[in-house]
Swiss-Prot record:
Organism of provenance: Gloeobacter violaceus (strain ATCC 29082 / PCC 7421)
Pfam families with a match to the protein in the record: MinE
Keywords recorded for this protein, A-Z: Cell cycle, Cell division
HAMAP family found in the cross-reference section: MinE
InterPro entries reported in the protein's UniProt record: MinE (IPR005527), MinE_sf (IPR036707)
Alphabetized SUPFAM superfamilies for the sequence: Cell division protein MinE topological specificity domain
Full protein name: Cell division topological specificity factor
Amino acid sequence: MVFDLLERLFNRNKTGSATVAKDRLKMVLAVDRTEIAPQTIEQIRKEILDVIVRYFEIDENEKFDVTLERERGSTAIIANVPIRRIRPEHI
């Protein structure tokens, strides 16, 4: 993608408000291209979290994030979940 190329060219650090804005823009574009309503994305996020907490203890102080990424004509749902450990009953 163009953003990735620019990032490689300028070798920017991935911190700060510019990165947050870029990530939000990517999410908006991906949602727009896949025609998924923001409410649907939020529902997907809640359902993913419901399943994950059945099997893992998560770190509630860390950010749980679900994003859509579009690359080479396909879209992927990416979940970033801060997991502390597997629940003992599933070991």
